[in-house]
């Protein structure tokens, strides 16, 4: 309930700067559980815009880098929306282990009917097409 209110306030604040249009007629028909949402990431504000608009229908668990998750300002909200903390692999001594653990957590969450929102590239889109490079989390999730 509190998370929906915060997302409502976020939508209102973001609408002061951005014009967002959403065809929600199709969203109202989706009753599935365990939905994997894969938006692209052209700008810094897109994750907040997409998350705040889709929360009312899906209540997705976002994947959030450790540095944002542990930030004292954001941490209460991260707990409120059941965000999944992702280790920053650039500073990680065992990136493969932590990535596999995060993917397994996502798979279990999806199987339990929770919805996940995952930005496949994990970085800003700075070209007309998004390059995923070696980011294979979506492939790994689908295989399981």
Question: Could you say what each language-model-derived stretch is?
Answer:
Residues 7, 16-144:
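Soluble catalytic domains of membrane acyltransferases
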């Amino acid at each position: 309930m509190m998370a929906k209110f915060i997302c409502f306030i976020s939508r209102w604040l973001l609408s002061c700067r951005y014009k967002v249009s959403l065809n929600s007629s199709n969203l109202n028909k989706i009753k599935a559980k365990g939905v994997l949402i894969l938006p692209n990431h052209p700008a810094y504000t897109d994750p907040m815009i997409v998350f705040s608009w889709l929360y009312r229908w899906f209540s997705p668990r976002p994947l959030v880098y450790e540095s944002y998750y542990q930030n004292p300002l954001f941490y209460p909200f991260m707990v409120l929306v059941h965000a999944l903390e992702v280790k920053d692999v650039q500073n990680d001594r065992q990136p493969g282990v932590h990535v596999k653990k995060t993917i397994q957590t996502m798979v279990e969450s999806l199987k339990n009917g929770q919805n996940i929102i995952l930005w496949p590239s994990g970085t800003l889109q700075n070209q007309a097409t998004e390059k995923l490079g070696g980011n294979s989390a979506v492939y790994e999730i689908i295989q399981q």
